Amino acid sequence: MRTLAIVNLKGGTGKTVSAANMAHILAALHRKKVLLVDGDKQGSASRYFSVYGEHDGTAALLTDPERDPAELIYSTGYNGLDAITSNMELYTTDRELWADEDDNHVMDLRRALDRVRNDYDFCIIDNGPAADIITLN
């Protein structure tokens, strides 16, 4: 699985639109299996594909690295395109992980996504406009 992260520390630059369109084009036109990871607390990519939820998603994956990521993957309704959602829980999770001095969480997301790497051709990560734990992952 090839992973592409869309990052810019400025808001309103088209990160979500770029990530969502790239994911959809890879799935629809190139027939690739794509996992879109919403790494923005606002959950814009999740809303884009109407899979926004109040629970689970990226925050749950980061707070419980042993959790099976397959439990957190939602179908977007588009063939070949799945998503791990995000919401404001990611804000709290980010603060908790930064405060945890006993562990280095920089590779948690990567380790979790490694468990589904054989299920997808691409992973597109939509990051928020911040240098937070999800962006560093």
Question: What residue ranges belong to the model's regions?
Answer:
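P-loop NTP-binding core
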Residues: 1-137
